[in-house]
Amino acid sequence: MDAAFVITPMGVLTITDTLYDDLDISIMDFIGPYIIGNIKIVQIDVRDIKYSDMQKCYFSYKGKIVPQDSNDLARFNIYSICTAYRSKNTIIIACDYDIMLDIEGKHQPFYLFPSIDVFNATIIEAYNLYTAGDYHLIINPSDNLKMKLSFNSSFCISDGNGWIIIDGKCNSNFLS
């Protein structure tokens, strides 16, 4: 696997094969160009973190997950450790409770939701709606379109105020 952005419930990360294995990431779905993944983790007591854990750990802050040796870590304003998680080969230290997604370096007020949230949409960014690879920006979508999108997708990305990014998972019968 080449480097890619993966959206997880803990935030967005750029992964390589090493990070993929360290965090035991499983790919769950795709929303257009975005990969939706899950990290297999178990919450641990912060007091159980050892010095040796810090040599190969990851930090989660403001919707982004980075390894401890990342240059991005210097830009994080980390004041406290909120919680910690153990993964397959490492730990993840969460430094805030913010679950906002940092997608492609643009800090946006978007969150990962089940596709049913499409019913709250007033604006939809739809990938793969009519044909594979297409993109559409739809203002005031019909209830019929929302229903079909909710059935075809498992997840959507939402700002919680009506802006939804979703994948139509097009096939030859979609919207016919």
UniProtKB/Swiss-Prot annotation:
Its main location: host cell. One of its GO terms (biological process) is symbiont-mediated suppression of host antigen processing and presentation of peptide antigen via MHC class II. Keywords: Host endosome, Host-virus interaction, Inhibition of host adaptive immune response by virus, Inhibition of host MHC class II molecule presentation by virus, Viral immunoevasion. Pfam families: Chordopox_A35R. Signal peptide: none annotated. The keyword Transmembrane helix does not apply. Mildly affects the expression of MHC class II molecules on the surface of host antigen presenting cells (APCs). This is Protein OPG163. It comes from Monkeypox virus.
